[in-house]
Amino acid sequence: ENNERMLSMDRPQYVNWIVREAGVVFEDQQPLNCYRLSYVIDDAILDDWALHIRRHYVPDDELEEDAALNKLTVEEYLRQYVIPQKGEPFGPTARSNDISEILFADLFEFILNYEVPRCKQHNRSGKNESEHGTDIIAYRFFAEGKAPHKNDELVAIEVKALLSSNEAGKVIKDAVTDSKKDEDRVSHTLNYYRKKLRFMGKSTEA
């Protein structure tokens, strides 16, 4: 049951804040599909969002067991071994990257109706070390029953995060440039996900 959450997440409440912005174009007048968070300060929704993010790293029962085995409280274990911290080398970058990737995974799954494996942050070798390969993979089957079809979709997603909007144009260009690498990386990422999902007990999805 816990590993099932790593592949198929419950819809977090904050997703209702995601709205599409119309009429956005890039420098060359190329239209862009843009979304923004139209949020309000709501502690219950923010707490639910935080729990949603944490479950990408470690499911509930596994967290309690790991903390107990290390003779730490749950909060101590998360800070020391799981969640990137701002005072650590590469911690802020790792945390920004993780949250951005989870946000885009939620967009593709809950707004655009793709299936998105949730295993990248799970049990990685270092909490401040992002996994290599394609940032996010999303897919959608055309036929019922997931029978192979020529109209099946596989999307390789390159995620870039920026704290300021001043260099948004450069970030978009960088994402386009780096996305071309995914033609080479996506097959390796698919194989990595297949093996990791099998390790997590999700042989059918793998």
What are these regions (language model features)?
Residues E1-E75, V82-K86:
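Nuclease-adjacent, charged terminal/linker segments that flank catalytic cores
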Residues L78, N128-A138:
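Charged, often glycine-rich, active-site loop that binds/positions anionic groups
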Residues V82-A105, S125-G126:
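A short, highly charged nucleic-acid-interacting micro-segment common to nuclease
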Residues F108, I136-A138, V155-A161:
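Conserved catalytic cores of phosphodiester-cleaving nucleases, focusing on short active-site segments
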Residues I111-E129:
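A short acidic/basic microdomain associated with nuclease active sites
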Residues L112, K120, A138-F142, A161-L163:
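Short, flexible loop/turn elements at secondary-structure junctions
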Residues Y139-A156:
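Active-site beta-strand-loop-beta-strand hairpin of nuclease catalytic cores
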Residues S165-A206:
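Acidic, metal/cofactor-coordinating or nucleic-acid-engaging core segments within structured domains
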